[in-house]
Amino acid sequence: MLPVLISETNESELIIQDLALRLGLDLLMRGEEEKELQLADDQYYLVRGKKKSHLQIGLKGKQKPILCNFTDWSNNKKKSNLLRCMKGLPSDCSVVDATAGFGRDALELATVSDSVVLIERVPWLHYLLQDGIKNSTEEYVLSLVSKFELIQSDARDF
């Protein structure tokens, strides 16, 4: 099930309609939320916020938003299995994350490599990755996401 785009910004309707078209999503305009509330407890929404965009289930705000939060993830000091597998790689290597998803693996890969190519085929997920990169502000996180090359494509075509 594809998410539905909702905008919490003051951008023009044309800009939001263009974004929905580029992402291949239906658009729910402001004021239409009320009629959707009863129908939408299990519907995913891509919310274009004023500062950050996120994915959420339902419109009632019961669930935590799902977003690319590279700053929070960088503070997780627990060593992952992915990093254990990458042990011994030369530090000047380039890595391809062919299924970028929300970018958590790519962030870890950036700690042990010179560059990371993130390939994501799903347009709205690619959009959330761009938003997460744009909203990274801490110096350490910026040093990691600056290694990213984000590509919207099917990895089989890359």
What are these model-derived regions, one by one?
Residues 20-23, 109, 133:
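Hydrophobic alpha-helical packing residues
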Residues 10, 101-104, 124:
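Gly/Ser/Thr-rich loops at beta-strand to alpha-helix junctions
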Residues 98:
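Conserved beta-strand/loop positions that form the S-adenosyl-L-methionine
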Residues 102-114:
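Conserved SAM-binding loop of SAM-dependent methyltransferases across substrates and taxa
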Residues 1-2, 114-116:
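Short, surface-exposed connector motifs at secondary-structure boundaries
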Residues 1-94, 119-158:
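S-adenosyl-L-methionine
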Residues 94, 114-115, 147:
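Residues at the starts of beta-strands that form the adenosine-phosphate
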